[in-house]
């Protein structure tokens, strides 16, 4: 779902400090 994808983005951003969707 879109909501879960949004949570995944925020989680990845927090974990890696660089948003994985920036690539």
UniProtKB/Swiss-Prot annotation:
Sample GO molecular function, one term: metal ion binding
GO cellular component annotations, sorted alphabetically? extracellular region
- State which Enzyme Commission number(s) the record gives: 3.1.1.4
Sorted keywords for this record are:
Calcium, Disulfide bond, Hydrolase, Lipid degradation, Lipid metabolism, Metal-binding, Neurotoxin, Presynaptic neurotoxin, Secreted, Toxin
Expression across tissues = Expressed by the venom gland.
Q: Write out the PTM section of this UniProt entry.
A: Contains 7 disulfide bonds.
Cofactors, names only: Ca(2+)
- Which reaction does this enzyme catalyse, per its entry? a 1,2-diacyl-sn-glycero-3-phosphocholine + H2O = a 1-acyl-sn-glycero-3-phosphocholine + a fatty acid + H(+)
**Is Ligase one of the keywords UniProt gives this record?**
no
Q: What class of enzyme is it?
A: hydrolase
Compartments it resides in: Secreted
Q: What does this protein do?
A: Snake venom phospholipase A2 (PLA2) that shows presynaptic neurotoxicity. PLA2 catalyzes the calcium-dependent hydrolysis of the 2-acyl groups in 3-sn-phosphoglycerides.
Q: Subunit composition?
A: Heterodimer of an acidic subunit and a basic chain. The acidic subunit is non-toxic, without enzymatic activity and comprises 3 peptides that are cross-linked by 7 disulfide bridges. The basic subunit is toxic, has phospholipase A2 activity and is composed of a single chain.
Protein name, as recorded: Basic phospholipase A2 CB2
Lineage, opening ranks? Eukaryota, Metazoa, Chordata, Craniata, Vertebrata
């Amino acid at each position: 779902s879109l909501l879960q994808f949004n949570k995944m983005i925020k989680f990845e951003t927090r974990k890696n400090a660089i948003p994985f969707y920036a690539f």
